[in-house]
Regions:
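Active-site microenvironment of metallo-dependent hydrolases
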Residues: 1-137
Length: 137
């Protein structure tokens, strides 16, 4: 038994862009069935949270409600290898390998607050504390 895990998340900014493993997992599941997508969502959310003893990963009443919404048609057409490019980041004064998935993720919510919608940041982002440090139970 294994747990999905390798997501670079931009830590290796020059030469790696493998932070789209979750989207690729959902795309593979999508090819099979809606039931397989449902199982994959569970594998990517509540199962890792339970393994690490975190009170997140589900949408039960009173939960934190971190949600990412994905357009299934855009995901189906998305080419993960075609979206990789090397760009220059002024912030880091360094080139960075990125993997574009424009349009796949349509909305992101942290604690129920919209922080991303179709390429635009939400008003709450950077102005109020939305998330929290997660510590194992």
């Amino acid at each position: 038994h294994t747990m999905p895990g390798f997501n670079d998340s931009g830590a290796h900014i020059t030469n790696m862009a493998f932070f789209d493993a979750n989207l690729n997992s959902l795309k593979l599941a999508q090819r099979k069935s809606l039931e397989t997508v449902s199982k994959m969502v569970k594998r990517l959310t509540s199962e890792p949270a339970a393994f690490f003893g975190l009170d997140v990963g589900t949408l039960e009443l009173g939960d934190q409600a971190d949600i990412t919404m994905i357009d299934p048609e855009v995901l189906r057409a998305w080419d993960d290898k075609g979206g990789r490019e090397l760009i220059y980041r002024d912030l880091f004064e360094h080139p960075q390998m990125v993997s574009r998935s424009d349009g796949v993720v349509t909305h992101t919510f942290i604690r129920g607050e919209k922080v991303w919608q179709n390429g635009d940041f939400g008003e709450a982002l950077g102005k109020q504390t939305l998330g929290r440090a997660l510590r194992a139970a």
